[in-house]
Amino acid sequence: MKHSKDPFEAAIEEEQEESPPESPVGGGGGGDGSEDGRIEIDQTQDEDERPVDVRRPMKKAKTSVVVTEAKNKDKDEDDEEEEENMDVELTKYPTSSDPAKMAKMQTILSQFTEDQMSRYESFRRSALQRPQMKKLLIGVTGSQKIGMPMIIVACGIAKMFVGELVETARVVMAERKESGPIRPCHIRESYRRLKLEGKVPKRSVPRLFR
């Protein structure tokens, strides 16, 4: 004798027979979920394989270079500002306006030849580079604290010495009846004469090698 099924139980059994079992997410079977899972895994692997360690040092190096250039630029600007301030301070001092000195200067200039006047004008326009003089003073004194007044004085003294060296070399060339540019032999003779006249400072420290 057959028992009749409950209508509710019969409906549940029919639904279970019609719907297939759900596949696990990210499983091996072919479906939308499995393809999305493989795509995510591949993207993760690609991101892990990127040469991150290679790019980061380059960015760091670029940053260090930019910082170094900025520091050097600030240092140059500070040096230029210091030079400008020193020039402004020097202009505050009154210039020599003694009539006797001015008349003497005019008398000397009137006796210059055309070649001498050209050299004198070049001498007045010329100037030694202050950064190079600063490096020289640092090497001589061994101190990094070199003030701008000291650099200006050293440049002025060196400029006067070079001018006397050139003029004495021209006198040597005139005595030898030679023309053209100044040669090393003329500079050596000029230096020897200036040394005999006491215009070359003596060494305070003896030479180690002769």
Swiss-Prot record:
Function as written in the Swiss-Prot or TrEMBL entry: TAFs are components of the transcription factor IID (TFIID) complex that is essential for mediating regulation of RNA polymerase transcription.
Underlying gene: TAF11
Protein name listed in UniProt: Transcription initiation factor TFIID subunit 11
Pfam families xrefs: TAFII28 (PF04719)
Family membership noted in the UniProt record: Belongs to the TAF11 family.
GO biological process assignments: RNA polymerase II preinitiation complex assembly
Expressing tissues: Expressed in roots, leaves and inflorescences.
Positions of the UniProt region annotated as Disordered: 1-98
GO cellular component terms attached to this protein's record: transcription factor TFIID complex
Alphabetical keyword list: Activator, Nucleus, Transcription, Transcription regulation
Composition bias, Acidic residues: 11-20, 76-87
Listed CDD domains: HFD_TAF11 (cd08048)
Subcellular location: Nucleus
Subunit structure: Component of the TFIID complex. TFIID is composed of TATA binding protein (TBP) and a number of TBP-associated factors (TAFs) whose MWs range from 14-217 kDa. Interacts with TAF12, TAF12B and TAF13.
Main location per the UniProt record: nucleus
Top-level taxon of the source organism: Eukaryota
Single Gene Ontology MF annotation: protein heterodimerization activity
Limits of the Histone-fold domain: 112-201
